[in-house]
């Protein structure tokens, strides 16, 4: 059974620092005619980034399963990372202070595995809110940029041909990337909402006796979380930091409401 102290010793947020700290995926539009060396270098960078992401996901999954006392699901996550790789990754974190109290919700006397369910809920809610907010930020930023180049063209009294050649066409790849990335964050937010709703269904069924929550249900929800972390776009650290305090307060309030509904009084 995970103790209250154990469940509190994690950085406050949806995903571990190793995952959040990775650079954002780059969406490029390579043009024909560029040398093969550049394409090879880009592919190598993508492979390295993918390997680093997978390693971080596996380490976080190992941490979660140890913290939550859940069995490792090799069918979903493959083999667990070896201790040497975990130690090597941990050495890249210079300041560990900001990464304490990850599951910052107050669990009180909620028994295991009900407390695990509440922590999984905080992860789902946190990620759902951040992905939706960042997708909206990208959409607004892209719209503002598109509007700014139109205004610039009007102020400069550009002809349509000049506007297309000098501003619109060069900006199109970046604008399309922004739209695509915003949509992917909104889709990720929707998927996190589905997991969140699933968690609520399990909690509602066992809210009178949280200790009777089936462990296999927690494992199933953990699998869903792992797959979303693996396939979803990352939220930048700076954006996460701007929202951290507010989201922590919101998820604490939500957890307190759920816990109060399970109290016999």
Predicted regions and their residues:
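Alpha-helical transmembrane segments and their immediate juxtamembrane boundary regions
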Residues: 2-50, 132-187
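Membrane-interface amphipathic/juxtamembrane segments adjacent to transmembrane helices
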Residues: 36-86
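Charged, amphipathic alpha-helical oligomerization/scaffolding segments
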Residues: 58, 62-65, 116-119, 123-126, ...
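Short, non-transmembrane cytosolic segments of multipass membrane proteins
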Residues: 73-111
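Membrane-proximal soluble regions of multi-pass membrane proteins
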Residues: 76-81, 115-122, 215-230
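Membrane-proximal, non-transmembrane alpha-helical segments
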Residues: 97-134
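Long, hydrophobic, amphipathic alpha-helical segments used as structural scaffolds
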Residues: 128, 132-135, 139, 203, ...
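Cytosolic/matrix-facing juxtamembrane and C-terminal tails of multi-pass cellular membrane proteins
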Residues: 182-260, 265
């Amino acid at each position: 059974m995970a103790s209250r102290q154990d469940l509190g010793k994690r950085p406050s947020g949806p995903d571990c620092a190793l995952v959040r700290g990775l650079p954002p995926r780059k969406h490029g539009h390579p043009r024909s005619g560029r040398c093969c060396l550049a394409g090879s270098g880009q592919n190598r960078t993508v492979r390295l980034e993918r390997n680093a992401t997978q390693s971080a996901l596996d380490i976080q999954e190992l941490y979660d399963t140890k913290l939550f006392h859940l069995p490792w699901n090799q069918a979903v996550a493959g083999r667990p990372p070896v201790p040497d790789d975990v130690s090597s990754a941990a050495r890249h974190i210079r300041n560990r202070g900001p990464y304490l109290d990850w599951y910052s919700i107050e669990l009180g006397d909620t028994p295991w595995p009900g407390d695990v369910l509440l922590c999984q809920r905080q992860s789902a809610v946190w990620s759902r809110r951040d992905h939706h907010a960042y997708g909206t930020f990208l959409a607004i930023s892209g719209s503002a940029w598109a509007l700014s180049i139109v205004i610039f063209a009007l102020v400069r009294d550009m002809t349509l041909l000049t506007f297309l050649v000098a501003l619109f066409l060069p900006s199109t790849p970046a604008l399309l990337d922004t739209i695509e990335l915003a949509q992917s964050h909104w889709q990720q937010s929707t998927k996190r909402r589905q997991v969140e709703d699933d968690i609520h269904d399990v909690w509602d069924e066992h809210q009178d006796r949280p200790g009777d929550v089936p462990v296999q249900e927690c494992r199933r929800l953990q699998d869903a979380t792992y797959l979303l972390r693996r396939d979803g776009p990352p939220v930048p650290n700076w954006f996460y930091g701007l929202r951290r305090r507010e989201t922590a307060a919101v998820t604490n309030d939500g957890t307190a409401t759920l816990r109060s509904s399970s109290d016999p009084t």
